Amino acid sequence: MRITVSGLPGSGTTSLSRYLSERYGFTMISAGEVFRQCAKEHNMELAEFGRLAEKDPAYDKMIDARQKEIAEKSDNIIVEGRLSGWMVENADLKIWLFAPISCRLDRIVFRDQIADVETAKAITLEREHCEAIRYQQYYSIDINDHSVYHLILNSEHWGVDDLGKIVAAAIDQLKKTPFAAS
């Protein structure tokens, strides 16, 4: 089974992906963690690295192509990333997580150890803007078009365990009634 988990920064995609990976024993690959690691390796903030990637498509395309290649050759995998629902066309379940910006910013401040919410907001909004432009330019993908997703969940009011249970119900149903991935 191939599952994609996508969403904007701070929506909980990495947490949910880890949960599902552990629950089902699936391999997990994460574009966000790869991107953050690359930014760190270049001694750059995320927004700064995003601007670099905006100027040189090789950064995004390398990460996206690698994720797609691994996913298409693997069974029982969770692919986490903003574009994974678009890139892994043969996924059995495509999930989009969302949450209000205030909720996402609180999570980002905690996760990335950013000094305050206003700084996190500036960084996050710039990152989202840069990414939306790149996705449109590189792949003709509108990140706000959720039509490829099978399951769209608001992560604001549920912790990862509760979200995991909702998704597990969908996975269990898919296991009972196999169908061709769309």
Curated annotation (Swiss-Prot):
GO terms for molecular function: ATP binding; CMP kinase activity; dCMP kinase activity. HAMAP family: Cytidyl_kinase_type2 (MF_00239). Its EC number is 2.7.4.25. The keyword Kinase applies. The lineage of its organism: Archaea, Methanobacteriati, Methanobacteriota, Stenosarchaea group, Methanomicrobia. Keywords: ATP-binding, Cytoplasm, Kinase, Nucleotide-binding, Transferase. NCBIfam families: cyt_kin_arch. Signal peptide: none annotated. Belongs to the cytidylate kinase family. Type 2 subfamily. The keyword Cell membrane does not apply. ATP binds at G7, L8, P9, G10, S11, G12, T13, T14, S15. This is Cytidylate kinase. One of its GO terms (biological process) is pyrimidine nucleotide metabolic process.
